[in-house]
Amino acid sequence: MIRLFEWLTQESLDLHYSLEESGIHGTSIVLNDDGFLPEGIISPYTFFCEVEMDGSPLYFNQLEVPYLWQITGTNIEGEIWNRSSKRGVIHYHEPKYLRFVQSVDWLYPDGSIYMTDHYNKYGWAFARTYFFSDQQVSHKKYYTKSGQEVLSENILTGDILLNWKGKVYHFTKKVDFFLFYFKKSGLDLSSIWYNSLGMPFLISYYLGGEGRDILFWQENLADQLPGNMQIIFSGRTSRTKKVIVQDRSVYKKLLHLVEEKNKEMISFLNIIYPKLRENYSRKEILIVTNSDQIEGIETLTDNLSAYTFHIGALTSMSDKLQNIGQKENVLLYPNMSPKTMLDLLEQCDIYLDINHGNEVLSIVRLAFERSLLILAYDNTVHSPIFHHESGIFNHSKPQTLSDWLLNLDDYSQTVSCWRSDLFPMTYRDYKQVLVSNVD
């Protein structure tokens, strides 16, 4: 079985994890390789360029630059200077604070980009993008470690040239290149599971023949089915016979949109998220914010005097937060490092999602995976998928949150119940729904 992803999005990683943890193994392929694919995930590029899984990421100041040029850097990005002229920008792979090079924009003296080098997790440049003077992309080329050009894509025309095993192959459409890859890969093509109606669907469609393909739908739906989904339900595909929806509300909407005869093709399976630890009902509260606008914080810190509040920020803190930090049960962590944040996630058993402004570093998901009790006000909810409705309180009555918490002794049981309500499907459900497609 093949799992086919167009991009390595968080949704793709979640599906990969859910299937692996359910014991449903297969080959995961990403069509667009950023050079930092996790172990066990491959791409057409790694196949044709015969990438050796050897080496380590390139640290930003190890980049080779012309003699007497200088490299400077922050935890956001690096820069390359020729005296007072900036000649390059170094972009880091996530997490940025590690400063591993993902790409380097090379600049003309006027600051425009003429070329971007793309680095992989083994520390060498595996691709290069070329730009016209108007900053439009012209070509992207892929190389072996020794620098031999293997693949060249004309972005404007869509033409692809592949130099492989002593022959040059010309493809006028990208889908034809991918079909060539699958036919040469030696992989079992009897079942392809994909999560996009873009290129992965086209590959399934044009590959033809008999197959047991599945579309995993991880997006929202409008009031009309997408065109390629209509093709699936009309029976015009020889391979895709099942659609798995991973959001319950979208699942219900899809059932409403399709004809009665097609409903049997549709099933629901939520994502299965990691559970990295248990909740120990400690009175340790975590808040992560880059804003001093924290809903109800005065009321909460006063009413929950027996609880310790750990308030962290990736930035410096305003006088307003510094004043809150004067309270005996409040500890502040300005300019907090990601490592400190992870340490606090292990130390705390309650996460208050009560900061206004943007969510910081997917903190709500990180808290959910570590079984923290997640509470919020109705005007501060971030990442609502991880919030149970029972843990969301009226912001005009901030004391209701603290009153509720004071009456709760066993956080672990509540967290377990909420998790089951939000994501009821288990590994057993995955096998039950999918087993006929992996036999």
Swiss-Prot record:
It comes from the Bacteria. It is found in: Cell membrane. It is a peripheral membrane protein. GO terms for biological process: protein O-linked glycosylation via serine; regulation of protein stability. Keywords: Cell membrane, Membrane. Disruption phenotype: No glycosylation of serine-rich fimbrial adhesin Fap1. The unglycosylated version of Fap1 accumulates which is larger than the wild-type protein. In a deletion mutant, GtfA (Gtf1) is less stable in vivo, no longer associates with the cell membrane and has an increased protease susceptibility. Biofilm formation decreases. In a double gftA/gtfB (gtf1/gtf2) mutant, there is no further affect on glycosylation but biofilm formation is further decreased. Its main location: membrane. GO terms for cellular component: plasma membrane; protein N-acetylglucosaminyltransferase complex. The keyword Membrane applies. Pathway: Protein modification; protein glycosylation. Belongs to the GtfB family. Required for the polymorphic O-glycosylation of the serine-rich repeat protein Fap1. A stabilizing protein that is part of the accessory SecA2/SecY2 system specifically required to export Fap1, a serine-rich fimbrial adhesin encoded upstream in the same operon. The GtfA-GtfB (Gtf1-Gtf2 in this bacteria) complex adds GlcNAc from UDP-GlcNAc to Fap1, attaching the first sugar residue. Cannot use not UDP-Glc as substrate. Stabilizes the glycosylation activity of GtfA, causing it to partially localize to the cellular membrane where it is more protease resistant. Interacts with glycosyltransferase GtfA (Gtf2); probably forms a heterotetramer with 2 subunits each of GtfA and GtfB. Part of the accessory SecA2/SecY2 protein translocation apparatus. This is UDP-N-acetylglucosamine--peptide N-acetylglucosaminyltransferase stabilizing protein GtfB. It comes from Streptococcus parasanguinis. The lineage of its organism: Bacteria, Bacillati, Bacillota, Bacilli, Lactobacillales. The gene is gtfB.
